[in-house]
C-alpha cells in the first residue's frame, strides 16, 4: 500500500457515523501543487499531522505511515512530524499513529507518547488495529 492509499483508506474508514467519528485532512504541498492551475510548486508550512479526528468525543491529531520493515519501526519513520507531535503532547493534546506494514499486510495503532518514548519498536510491541 502506498502512503497515499493508506491515507485515503484511513480517511474513508473513519469518516463514518457508524464509528461515531469524523476526520479532516490537512492540505499538504502535494495537494496544493496538484490543485494549482499554473502547475508551479507550492510550498506550505509543515502540518502537525495528516489528519485531525474526533471519535467518541475525543479529538486527536492522526498521522498515517506505511513501512516495508519486516521487524518493526525506526525513528526515521516518525522524524518529520516529531517536533510538532511533541508540542501537541506537551500541551496535553492527543496524537495517534496508524501504521500499515506492507510486509505483514496489517494495520497497527500507537499513541504519540508510545512512539516518543521509543520509536524503534518491534511489531509485537504494537497494538494491532482490526479495521
Q: Model-flagged regions — what are they?
A:
Residues 26, 61-64, 98:
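Short, conserved beta-strand edge motifs with alternating hydrophobic and charged residues
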Residues 67-88:
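Mg2+/Mn2+-dependent nuclease catalytic core
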Residues 51-53, 57-69:
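Conserved catalytic cores of phosphodiester-cleaving nucleases, focusing on short active-site segments
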Residues 41-44, 77-78:
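A conditional alpha-helix N-cap/helix-loop micro-motif detector
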Residues 1-42:
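Acidic-basic catalytic patches of nuclease active cores, encompassing PD-(D/E)XK
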Residues 86-115:
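Nucleic-acid nuclease catalytic cores
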Residues 47:
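Beta-rich catalytic cores
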Residues 108-131:
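Intrinsically disordered, low-complexity terminal regions enriched in charged/polar residues
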Amino acid at each position: 500500500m502506498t502512503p497515499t492509499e493508506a491515507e485515503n483508506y484511513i480517511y474513508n474508514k473513519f469518516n463514518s457515523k457508524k464509528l461515531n467519528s469524523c476526520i479532516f485532512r490537512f492540505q499538504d504541498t502535494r495537494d496544493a501543487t496538484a490543485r494549482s492551475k499554473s502547475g508551479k510548486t507550492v510550498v506550505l508550512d509543515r502540518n502537525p499531522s495528516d489528519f485531525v479526528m474526533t471519535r467518541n468525543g475525543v479529538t486527536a491529531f492522526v498521522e498515517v505511515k506505511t513501512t516495508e520493515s519486516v521487524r518493526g519501526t525506526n525513528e526515521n519513520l516518525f522524524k518529520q512530524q516529531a517536533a510538532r507531535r511533541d508540542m501537541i503532547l506537551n500541551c496535553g493534546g492527543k496524537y495517534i499513529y496508524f501504521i500499515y506494514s506492507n510486509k505483514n499486510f496489517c494495520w497497527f495503532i500507537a499513541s504519540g507518547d508510545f512512539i516518543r518514548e521509543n520509536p524503534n519498536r518491534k511489531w509485537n510491541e504494537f497494538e494491532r488495529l482490526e479495521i
